[in-house]
């Protein structure tokens, strides 16, 4: 979208832009699809994931994938961008925003971060009504500190509002003009792969618990 990364719309025959997009959190549902859409828009993609998912993201088209838990991940990605021009970054997952700030602060090109998620405080999500006010205060503090860090590094950002796709040109271009043919000819694949837990409403709680524990490169599914 124009007020985010402003990438061209995806096509079946993209013109190479000569630029590289950083997708932090590539093994998530958002990340897997972002990688493919960016490539279809003419961009090279560098991503992050746990080592077990590196080969999967490369099959989706990422040229390089780094371990987000590595203590040298920021320096490693900056090094990978040494002879590249950044198209910006998409931050997905806890801690991703500040890491992306550090990376883009050391790169040439578009220093803009499209935020798909906000950082959850270390205390986790509120478990009851009394936990909600301090939770929101911690979230606000995290967001403000992130904005300050962005400014110091010459980086700008904006939180993504998914509902915007319903009222602008991007939603139609992707869901009506691009995806039907791309899915049919295999240039875009549904990702991540589904992990079916079982059938029936009685399996929903099990699926929720599994999702809460954390999954990567999988989409938890309950059939009805």
Q: Residue ranges of each PLM-predicted region?
A:
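Terminal helix/beta-alpha structural elements that buttress the NAD(P)+-binding lobe
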Residues: 1-224
């Amino acid at each position: 979208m124009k007020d985010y990364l402003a990438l061209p719309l995806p096509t079946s025959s993209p013109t190479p832009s000569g630029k590289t997009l950083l997708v932090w959190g590539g093994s998530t549902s958002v990340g897997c699809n972002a990688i493919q859409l960016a490539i279809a828009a003419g961009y090279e993609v560098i991503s992050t994931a746990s080592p077990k998912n590196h080969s999967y993201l490369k099959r989706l088209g990422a040229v390089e994938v780094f371990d987000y838990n590595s203590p040298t991940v920021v320096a490693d990605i900056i090094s990978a961008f040494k002879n590249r021009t950044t198209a910006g970054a998409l931050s997905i997952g806890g801690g991703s925003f500040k890491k992306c700030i550090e990376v883009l602060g050391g790169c040439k090109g578009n220093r803009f971060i499209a935020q798909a998620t906000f950082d959850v405080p270390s205390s986790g999500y509120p478990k009851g009504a009394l936990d909600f006010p301090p939770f929101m205060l911690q979230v606000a503090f995290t967001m403000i500190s992130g904005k300050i860090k962005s400014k110091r590094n010459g980086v700008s950002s904006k939180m993504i509002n998914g509902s915007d796709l319903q009222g602008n040109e991007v939603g139609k271009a992707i869901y009506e003009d691009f995806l039907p043919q791309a899915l049919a000819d295999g240039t875009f694949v549904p990702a991540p792969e589904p992990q079916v837990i079982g059938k029936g409403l009685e399996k929903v709680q099990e699926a929720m618990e599994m999702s809460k524990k954390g999954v990567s490169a999988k989409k938890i599914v309950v059939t009805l």
